[in-house]
């Protein structure tokens, strides 16, 4: 006599949607919009019909996945949580690392799926720059440009380092980018009357 396995605990619609969204993101990066509901169901460990009970359609699921991945709020919270007591170099390295991970994730999804989902706005970019400036604020007197301008530079360099066709050649690591941001490519300028 065989024993029937116990039925899985019932999840709320939101929990089920979250579980499916967790499963679909890597599949979207790998297969783009051609990912099948069968692949999604297998990856999530659910029946195909469960997808349609949670999202009504594959298009709704893909849109929800893109919206979730492009939502800037979780990323903002990560940046806001950076310890202001860390030395400046460690804070900049942490910002570079978080930004590169975020940009790489967004680029991978956009490459695989296209421009589906919420558009990037200048308001979001400005909010991000202000947040980066806030993380830099404890070292305001050490900065050679204002904190918002410094935030723009960090974001710009992290963005450029995250675009595969811009970074032809060996990849930069976070330490190299941090040094470039903080010290440039020639270091500190020599004062005009300094002995050689």
Task: Identify what each model region corresponds to.
Residues 13, 17, 66, 121-129:
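Amphipathic, non-transmembrane alpha-helical scaffold segments
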Residues 45-55:
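Short hydrophobic/aromatic patch on the recognition helix
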Residues 77-105, 154:
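Hydrophobic alpha-helical connector segments
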